[in-house]
Amino acid sequence: MTGMRGLSVFISDVRNCQNKEAERLRVDKELGNIRTCFKNEKVLTPYKKKKYVWKMLYIHMLGYDVDFGHMEAVSLISAPKYPEKQVGYIVTSCLLNENHDFLKLAINTVRNDIIGRNETFQCLALTLVGNIGGRDFAESLAPDVQKLLISSSCRPLVRKKAALCLLRLFRKNPDAVNVDGWADRMAQLLDERDLGVLTSSTSLLVALVSNNHEAYSSCLPKCVKILERLARNQDVPQEYTYYGIPSPWLQVKAMRALQYFPTIEDPSTRKALFEVLQRILMGTDVVKNVNKNNASHAVLFEALSLVMHLDAEKEMMSQCVALLGKFISVREPNIRYLGLENMTRMLMVTDVQDIIKKHQSQIITSLKDPDISIRRRALDLLYGMCDVSNAKDIVEELLQYLSTAEFSMREELSLKAAILAEKFAPDLSWYVDVILQLIDKAGDFVSDDIWFRVVQFVTNNEDLQPYAASKAREYLDKIAIHETMVKVSAYILGEYGHLLARQPGCSASELFSILHEKLPTISTPTIPILLSTYAKLLMHAQPPDPELQKKVWAVFKKYESCIDVEIQQRAVEYFELSKKGPAFMDVLAEMPKFPERQSSLIKKAENVEDTADQSAIKLRAQQQPSNAMVLADQQPVNGAPPPLKVPILSGSTDPESVARSLSHPNGTLSNIDPQTPSPDLLSDLLGPLAIEAPPGAVSNEQHGPVGAEGVPDEVDGSAIVPVEEQTNTVELIGNIAERFHALCLKDSGVLYEDPHIQIGIKAEWRGHHGRLVLFMGNKNTSPLTSVQALILPPAHLRLDLSPVPDTIPPRAQVQSPLEVMNIRPSRDVAVLDFSYKFGANVVSAKLRIPATLNKFLQPLQLTSEEFFPQWRAISGPPLKLQEVVRGVRPLALPEMANLFNSFHVTICPGLDPNPNNLVASTTFYSESTGAILCLARIETDPADRTQLRMTVGTGDPTLTFELKEFIKEQLITVPMGSRALVPAAGPAPPVAQPPSPAALADDPGAMLAGLL
């Protein structure tokens, strides 16, 4: 820009403008002049074009829209001289975006500059592509940029720009960047001595491993060596040392890349990494210099994340928690925020919860911090660290904070307080007190689900009903109460107000009067609840009260002509029913007990907006089974269906006849066991509550009765197997068959849960090898003894289960790795024969292990040039099998494609000319066959989605048949009544039985024979 007098004068004129209008006039005048000059190309010299393009850029920087001259800017890129080319690249990257059509005109020029010998031109081109390159640039330039990155003849300046440029292209179009065999190249780049190239290459590595970490396992030790080099400050130039910290950016990137790898198997590499992490943890402290603080703590918090990922020794974990405890008490708000956030992440790690509790008082203090973001993190941490031991203190603090909290936080605060109060209630009266306080203090922010839930608890617990009614009566004495309190009080008093009849001020007439005082203040949706309450008060009035009847009838008559249909219908029907005497009592009998259902509040808590980026930690958190176990040693609630006992099945017993004997004609299960029902109150939280019409009979879909798991379930009709004679049952939390089927399509989750233990699985699959970890968590305050776990493997799998400890301590979790090797294709599954002793009973269960056929498939995307030659090369049967499948679940094509992708069979779009068909490919791995390409074609009928034609082809006849049958199983819903027993198809229900020496000495082979 040196010597451009016209540009300098224009900038001075703009700066000298007295107001915005004068500036606009000057800019418009200049834009008109530029437009005129661009039209007259004969007098437009390269100098003038360059000057006018600079002016356009300056006007753009001022915030004005520049909608012309883009072609002139792009044309400067092809100029042979550096000054014009520089202007072209700079202005183009500022004025245009990746989707602009003019950019396509410059692709060839940019490519020529990249592959040319002029390093200055290469840098300009790489900078442009790295800033605004899109999918078109990725398809055209990715191979050239890759060559430039690994070229030994290029200067480091060019190579580091090439690395960042390739990163941009990979993000925009991963398929266009050929990464086959690129792992070795990346490993070589990580040996680079120039820290600029190394930092850029590490940024590229983070993106690559986040997409596919398995291919880059050779880079793992290289990242550790980078950290060692920086930790020892070896060969680190001064320009890369920031306030005494060797290249903090590179340290953070290297540790972030390591977090995408599942484990570090090599002992020496693991030891070296832990030494580096220990040095970082010990060498970081809070100093006065803000810049140094920011850099050192960026490295530290990334190190903490890596420590959590690696499941380091307890001593290092304790050190991390102590360090975070120090950070949450410093004055610097940014460090406090990060300390709270990382302490919340630490809750995911086993055995550190008790250490975190030591900082509870400081965390509660953070709840009163002036910064709302810190208060939110403190709330999340308190919610995550809460258990039976500290629930009362935390919930009371949340209730106290509720009065002063911002309105934007109150809904989340109310939701979490309600969940904690229920989940860890020492007794139900305390839970009722908490919820009523919650409604009283923050009624506007208490969702209907919360008061529905307290009504459910009161309904299901007879001992709680008088207490809840008396508390509801107390709140009605307040001058001003929230409408939600009117709803819950009216409902409870209508159902159970008669239990207080002998207490002063609690007669039916007095309850009617105090409730009727609230009627003018409530909204239309609450009036139906009050009408129901009035009807019930009238019914419970003993002896009959003519005065009360007169008042209630007057209310009913008033609302008989209400415009609201619901109110009108209730008023008319209650009025007529109240005239029928004894029949009135039959119609308005006490509400039946509510079933336990899936928690709607838990879903709400999980859906609270999280603004964090998709880091490696967050991606892992979505895949890991939760370490938070539901506590089961609380006071039980009456009212859910009793556990169902399984009849003794002989070898000749027909399971379908058993299912019929257990079922009514309408499909509901008979209540065989007459014992008092007592499900676990805290087994699983909250479900939507239909107050006006709770079901009188509970279907098996809401409860999986132990011993009949799978009898009424259409997903798995073979879950009943011959079992030993039993005298007791243990209740099951969740559906075993549904849990197994879910784990067949994902790699982590809960396999089994009852009131005493929770068994989770986390798996990692690579080729024909798999590594599973069984997480067994004791949910009680008493130890589980005589714990035994035995694997019953099918012939096609080789399994090795690490020994399981004989005893699981209270509130503890143990882990047992399971190595799986696939020998040949088969759909059979392994079975875990698991048992433990709790108190005087032995509980046993046979559980299917989700090491299914699809776990040994690797997704593979093929182009038409790759697919069709392979498809034609596979001859007919038995390598290629075709079948018309009927009874298919009606799925739209996108849903079917998602289903295929979930079991690692990749849909190849655009290969079949018929839009109603799907073409798919994958690779199967086993020890005997190696890697085998698998191809499939699904032909659907838009007029009838319940049938399709499926063709599967592979290089192995057994694999073809097994894969075809597996896909068919995923597509078909087989009715329960027509399903036969399948070998090893269903888990045995958990059976609680008196300890018997003969039972404990059962032969594993006999167990397997019984299962089959």
Swiss-Prot record:
<comment type="similarity">
    <text>Belongs to the adaptor complexes large subunit family.</text>
</comment>
<dbReference type="InterPro" id="IPR011989">
    <property type="entry name" value="ARM-like"/>
</dbReference>
<dbReference type="GO" id="GO:0006886">
    <property type="term" value="P:intracellular protein transport"/>
</dbReference>
<dbReference type="InterPro" id="IPR002553">
    <property type="entry name" value="Clathrin/coatomer_adapt-like_N"/>
</dbReference>
<dbReference type="Pfam" id="PF02883">
    <property type="entry name" value="Alpha_adaptinC2"/>
</dbReference>
<feature type="repeat" description="HEAT 1">
    <location>
        <begin position="254"/>
        <end position="289"/>
    </location>
</feature>
<keyword id="KW-0653">Protein transport</keyword>
<feature type="domain" description="GAE">
    <location>
        <begin position="742"/>
        <end position="841"/>
    </location>
</feature>
<keyword id="KW-0677">Repeat</keyword>
<dbReference type="GO" id="GO:0072583">
    <property type="term" value="P:clathrin-dependent endocytosis"/>
</dbReference>
<dbReference type="InterPro" id="IPR017104">
    <property type="entry name" value="AP2_complex_asu"/>
</dbReference>
<dbReference type="InterPro" id="IPR009028">
    <property type="entry name" value="Coatomer/calthrin_app_sub_C"/>
</dbReference>
<dbReference type="GO" id="GO:0030122">
    <property type="term" value="C:AP-2 adaptor complex"/>
</dbReference>
<dbReference type="InterPro" id="IPR016024">
    <property type="entry name" value="ARM-type_fold"/>
</dbReference>
<feature type="region of interest" description="Disordered">
    <location>
        <begin position="652"/>
        <end position="678"/>
    </location>
</feature>
<dbReference type="GO" id="GO:0035615">
    <property type="term" value="F:clathrin adaptor activity"/>
</dbReference>
<keyword id="KW-0168">Coated pit</keyword>
<dbReference type="InterPro" id="IPR012295">
    <property type="entry name" value="TBP_dom_sf"/>
</dbReference>
<feature type="compositionally biased region" description="Polar residues">
    <location>
        <begin position="663"/>
        <end position="675"/>
    </location>
</feature>
<keyword id="KW-0446">Lipid-binding</keyword>
<keyword id="KW-0254">Endocytosis</keyword>
<dbReference type="GO" id="GO:0009536">
    <property type="term" value="C:plastid"/>
</dbReference>
<feature type="repeat" description="HEAT 3">
    <location>
        <begin position="393"/>
        <end position="430"/>
    </location>
</feature>
<dbReference type="InterPro" id="IPR050840">
    <property type="entry name" value="Adaptor_Complx_Large_Subunit"/>
</dbReference>
<feature type="repeat" description="HEAT 4">
    <location>
        <begin position="525"/>
        <end position="565"/>
    </location>
</feature>
<dbReference type="Pfam" id="PF02296">
    <property type="entry name" value="Alpha_adaptin_C"/>
</dbReference>
<dbReference type="GO" id="GO:0008289">
    <property type="term" value="F:lipid binding"/>
</dbReference>
<keyword id="KW-0813">Transport</keyword>
<comment type="function">
    <text>Subunit of the adaptor protein complex 2 (AP-2). Adaptor protein complexes function in protein transport via transport vesicles in different membrane traffic pathways. Adaptor protein complexes are vesicle coat components and appear to be involved in cargo selection and vesicle formation. AP-2 is involved in clathrin-dependent endocytosis in which cargo proteins are incorporated into vesicles surrounded by clathrin (clathrin-coated vesicles, CCVs) which are destined for fusion with the early endosome. The complex binds polyphosphoinositides.</text>
</comment>
<comment type="subunit">
    <text>Adaptor protein complex 2 (AP-2) is a heterotetramer composed of two large adaptins (alpha-type and beta-type subunits), a medium adaptin (mu-type subunit) and a small adaptin (sigma-type subunit). Binds to EPSIN2.</text>
</comment>
<keyword id="KW-0472">Membrane</keyword>
<feature type="repeat" description="HEAT 2">
    <location>
        <begin position="354"/>
        <end position="391"/>
    </location>
</feature>
<protein>
    <recommendedName>
        <fullName>AP-2 complex subunit alpha-1</fullName>
    </recommendedName>
</protein>
<dbReference type="InterPro" id="IPR013041">
    <property type="entry name" value="Clathrin_app_Ig-like_sf"/>
</dbReference>
<dbReference type="Pfam" id="PF01602">
    <property type="entry name" value="Adaptin_N"/>
</dbReference>
<dbReference type="InterPro" id="IPR008152">
    <property type="entry name" value="Clathrin_a/b/g-adaptin_app_Ig"/>
</dbReference>
<dbReference type="InterPro" id="IPR003164">
    <property type="entry name" value="Clathrin_a-adaptin_app_sub_C"/>
</dbReference>
